């Protein structure tokens, strides 16, 4: 920039201050006051006693060198030798105090950044500014540093005092110095607590903007304010002359000035608030954002996913209540901003959608075993989970045991995460766990009894208030319900009396999914990634989770007597006991099914003429089609399921026509 216009010393100091521009340091002021003890006056220049400590002598010689090197040769300084000597002694005493405190903290001076400047003011007279900081310094340590420096400063002042004092007067002088706080720390007063807290300053900014811009004192006694000498840990400002100091200040100011001025708009609410957030508030808000982002809804999830923040809050006073309230805010945020369908959908791994087959999922295999259109059933469930079912806000899985009700409901609840459970054992507060949730799970529901009206309100998605144990009432917002049962919940009994007036209202609030086929023992559980992929597949293929889309796809809103088998699917589904791909399933043929018979001669005519059928099995085809050799083979070829009685009959008629049976039987008789 200006390598040819400025000296290397000026540019070196400027770059050094820029490197330290963001370092926070303590700001101390050393001073003394005029004291009178038993008629003896002790002023600011009464501390010129010759020092016997070798380290103090070395520090004093360093101050003398700094003064000589920073003198401007264009004019001669008018400061007398007595004033100079007093400043040199003060400089050595201040640095001695700093080094002694560093020694007590086991901090190496090389790891510390400091700056010292002696000044004269109209009101305080002589005083010394000290900036000190480093990686081992923190804001709460500021007051401890002030107390320690005050003790060392008072002790060394008494040692350097050249006024003849008795031992008692020396002790009194030290008490005055300590009680009057001749070492002060820069602090600020909190608006609400009214307490003083340490205020750190930026090292580079404070030196360039404040200290280097001052004028040097050249008269004795000093008439105006200014500085005597300054030094620092990097030996950068020690030997700068007054003009060079002003030039460094100007260069630093020009380079650190922002190019554009950012304007901020403060709303009336923010201006009215006018408060400073505490560190605890900022920490809680940061933790809360992380919990919501990671969908943490229980203390166990918090312990596993964010153990550091959990331990930090637990260690604070009232930590248990703080954890509970923070988690409640997190679940409330999820319940108000997301639906159960949203929470399931965001867990889908889109990379698996390309090879995903909805027909191969355990959920769809259960539905297909009942002959249902599994896409239609899943679409209806997703509409309810997305709060689009209107008054029909509950998915009811009912039927005999071991038909897959609970494993489907469990997979959905696990995918949602933020789930509340109905507790039938808690007669007075059964919905205690159902507030601020995205889904309510009612497992093995029974007779509603006295709670039927509450159940109807929650199952229809109404906003109601419930009582909680040890608390006041709390509001439950519209929340989808998933319910499993082996009983007929539409029959309400209060005492020994049935209430049929509740049957139809309960049916109007339910998405009826009646499972009747028992699963084999090796069927297994529904995978946790299954429902997220099902939801993503539906969205990808145009089955949006809205009732308008459902009606456009399937014709009408689902009701209690909904026929899930219509419209039929063309895609075959494997049986429940098989985990193989449909392409690997062997075709059903007469030879593979081992339907060979050896009829008697008297029964040949009956076998060929009378249809083999049961009261529940329709007769297969006409006589013309039954007597052809192709009818039986086509009845089972290409099918991916077990043959019906009609297909078996067609196969037998194809293999054992009357003429063929008589011919085979006659051949056997001839051989015998």
Curated annotation (Swiss-Prot):
Annotated GO MF terms: ATP binding; ATP hydrolysis activity; DNA binding; endonuclease activity; helicase activity; metal ion binding
Domain of life: Viruses
Keywords linked to the UniProt accession: ATP-binding, Covalent protein-DNA linkage, DNA replication, DNA-binding, Endonuclease, G1/S host cell cycle checkpoint dysregulation by virus, Helicase, Host G2/M cell cycle arrest by virus, Host nucleus, Host-virus interaction, Hydrolase, Magnesium, Metal-binding, Modulation of host cell apoptosis by virus, Modulation of host cell cycle by virus, Nuclease, Nucleotide-binding, Transcription, Transcription regulation, Viral DNA replication, Viral genome packaging, Viral release from host cell
Cofactor, how bound (note): The endonuclease active site can probably bind other divalent cations.
Residue numbers spanned by region Transactivation: 543-672
Top-level class of the enzyme under EC nomenclature: hydrolase
Location of the PV NS1-Nuc domain: 21-259
Organism taxonomic ancestry: Viruses, Monodnaviria, Shotokuvirae, Cossaviricota, Quintoviricetes
Organism: Hamster parvovirus H1
UniProt-annotated location(s): Host nucleus
GO cellular component, one term: host cell nucleus
Record-level GO BP terms: DNA replication; symbiont-mediated arrest of host cell cycle during G2/M transition; symbiont-mediated perturbation of host apoptosis; symbiont-mediated perturbation of host cell cycle G1/S transition checkpoint; viral DNA genome replication
Subunit structure: Homooligomer; when bound to DNA.
Main location, first listed in the record: host cell
Binding site for a divalent metal cation: 119, 127, 129
Substrates-to-products reaction catalysed: ATP + H2O = ADP + phosphate + H(+)
Residues spanning the membrane: none
Family: Belongs to the parvoviruses initiator protein NS1 family.
Reported modifications of this chain: Phosphorylated.
Assigned EC number: 3.1.21.-, 3.6.4.12
Chain span(s) of sequence motif RCR-2: 127-129
Name listed for the protein in its UniProt record: Initiator protein NS1
């Amino acid at each position: 920039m200006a390598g040819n216009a400025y000296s290397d010393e000026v540019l070196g100091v400027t770059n050094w201050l820029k490197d330290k521009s963001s370092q926070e340091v303590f700001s101390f002021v050393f001073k003394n006051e005029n004291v009178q003890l038993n008629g003896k006056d002790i002023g600011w220049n009464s501390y010129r006693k010759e020092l016997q400590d070798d380290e103090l002598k070395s520090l004093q010689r360093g101050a003398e060198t700094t003064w000589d090197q920073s003198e401007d040769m264009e004019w001669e300084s008018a400061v007398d030798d007595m004033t100079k000597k007093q400043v040199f002694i003060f400089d050595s005493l201040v640095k001695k105090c700093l080094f002694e405190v560093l020694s007590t903290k086991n901090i190496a001076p090389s790891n510390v950044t400091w700056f010292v400047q002696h000044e004269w003011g109209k009101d305080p007279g002589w005083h010394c500014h000290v900036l000190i900081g480093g990686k081992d310094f923190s804001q709460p340590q500021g007051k401890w540093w002030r107390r320690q420096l005050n003790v060392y400063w008072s002790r060394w002042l008494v040692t350097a005092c050249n006024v003849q004092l008795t031992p008692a007067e020396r002790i009194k002088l030290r008490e005055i110095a300590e009680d009057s706080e001749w070492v002060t720390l820069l602090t600020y007063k909190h608006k609400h607590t009214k307490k003083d807290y340490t205020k750190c300053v930026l090292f580079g900014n404070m030196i360039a903007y404040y200290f280097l811009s001052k004028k040097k004192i050249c008269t004795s006694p000093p008439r105006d304010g200014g500085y005597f000498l300054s030094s620092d840990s990097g030996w950068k400002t020690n030997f700068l002359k007054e003009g060079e100091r002003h030039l460094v200040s100007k260069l630093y100011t020009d380079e650190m000035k922002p190019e554009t001025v950012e304007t901020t708009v403060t709303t009336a609410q923010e201006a009215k608030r006018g408060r400073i957030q505490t560190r605890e508030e900022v920490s809680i808000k940061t933790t809360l954002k992380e919990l919501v982002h990671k969908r943490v809804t229980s203390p166990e999830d918090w312990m596993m996913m964010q153990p550091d923040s959990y331990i930090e809050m637990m260690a604070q006073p009232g930590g248990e209540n703080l954890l509970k309230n923070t988690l409640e805010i997190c679940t409330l945020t999820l319940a108000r901003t997301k639906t159960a369908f949203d929470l399931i959908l965001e867990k889908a791994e889109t990379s698996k959608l390309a090879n995903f087959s909805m027909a191969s999922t355990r959920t769809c295999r259960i539905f297909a075993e009942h002959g249902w259109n599994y896409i239609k059933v899943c679409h209806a469930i997703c509409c309810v989970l997305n709060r689009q079912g209107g008054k029909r806000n509950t998915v009811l899985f009912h039927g005999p045991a071991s038909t897959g009700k609970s494993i489907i409901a469990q997979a959905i609840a696990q995918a949602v995460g933020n789930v509340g459970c109905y507790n039938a054992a808690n007669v007075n507060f059964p919905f205690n766990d159902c507030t601020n949730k995205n889904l309510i799970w009612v497992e093995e529901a029974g007779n509603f009894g006295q709670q039927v009206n509450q159940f109807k309100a929650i199952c229809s998605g109404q906003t109601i208030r419930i009582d909680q144990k040890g608390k006041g009432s709390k509001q439950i917002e519209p929340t989808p319900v998933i319910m499993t049962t082996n009983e007929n919940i539409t029959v309400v009994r209060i005492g020994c009396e049935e209430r049929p007036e509740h049957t139809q209202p309960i049916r109007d609030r339910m998405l009826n999914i009646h499972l009747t086929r028992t699963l084999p023992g090796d069927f297994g559980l529904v995978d946790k990634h299954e429902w997220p992929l099902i939801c993503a597949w539906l969205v990808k293929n145009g089955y949006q989770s809205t009732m308008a889309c459902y009606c456009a796809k399937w014709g009408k809103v689902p009701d209690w007597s909904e026929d899930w088998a219509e419209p039929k699917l063309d895609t075959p589904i494997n049986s429940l006991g098989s985990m193989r791909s449909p392409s690997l399933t062997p075709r059903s043929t007469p030879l593979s099914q081992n339907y060979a018979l050896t009829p008697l001669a008297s029964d040949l005519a009956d076998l060929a003429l009378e249809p083999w059928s049961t009261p529940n099995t329709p007769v297969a085809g006409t006589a013309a089609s039954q007597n052809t050799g192709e009818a039986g083979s086509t009845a089972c070829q290409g099918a991916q399921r077990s043959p019906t009685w009609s297909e078996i009959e067609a196969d037998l008629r194809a293999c054992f026509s009357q003429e063929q049976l008589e011919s085979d039987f006659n051949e056997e008789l001839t051989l015998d």
